[in-house]
């Protein structure tokens, strides 16, 4: 690192004509020796110079990394990438993976129901199939993140969903959409719980991942499905359900 001479030193160097050291070294100095050379001074570091004072070093990577080097696992089955990632966070992510897969499975059952020939609501079938794929995508995002942080993905059992969604009073369309709204709110609660686990364990990276990738999107999903429920309650079980289905099919709602 190069250091420019201060103005004070420049003035002294231009007017000094004597020999020897202008500033003799002392125990409290930085051990810099000033030697005259004609009309100039040469600055040299004496033996034993304090390099921190000379270079302004505030970070010594080879010293500070020693502690981290000691923490690098040597056994073949332990993650090398894991850092500041608690067991609680790892377990909570696995739980959220299971939530996303279960919700995806219910949506897939709804898709299969509305795609039947004796139900024939293709718009609802498309909506729930897209929803199923989206939730599965969320599960895969959490799996990828788990591996990225050095955790271990542990898939859990998925409950078998019901296959009949007709409702004598509400009809199948409204009943299914109310179920979807409840699932989205439940998913939001689970995401908030996962976020709180990150906060509790001072895992700012997990908190950022949940907040930036999921929480905002979850609010949008709840709002959209809430509007669908309100509209279906207005039209009842009659001919309006078919028109609503066509709007879903053509992405007009």
UniProtKB/Swiss-Prot annotation:
Residues 1-45 form a transit peptide. Induction: By abscisic acid (ABA). GO terms for molecular function: ferric iron binding; ferroxidase activity. Its EC number is 1.16.3.1. It comes from the Eukaryota. It holds the Pfam family Ferritin. PANTHER family: FERRITIN, FERRITIN-2, CHLOROPLASTIC-RELATED. This is Ferritin-2, chloroplastic. It comes from Arabidopsis thaliana. The lineage of its organism: Eukaryota, Viridiplantae, Streptophyta, Embryophyta, Tracheophyta. The gene is FER2.
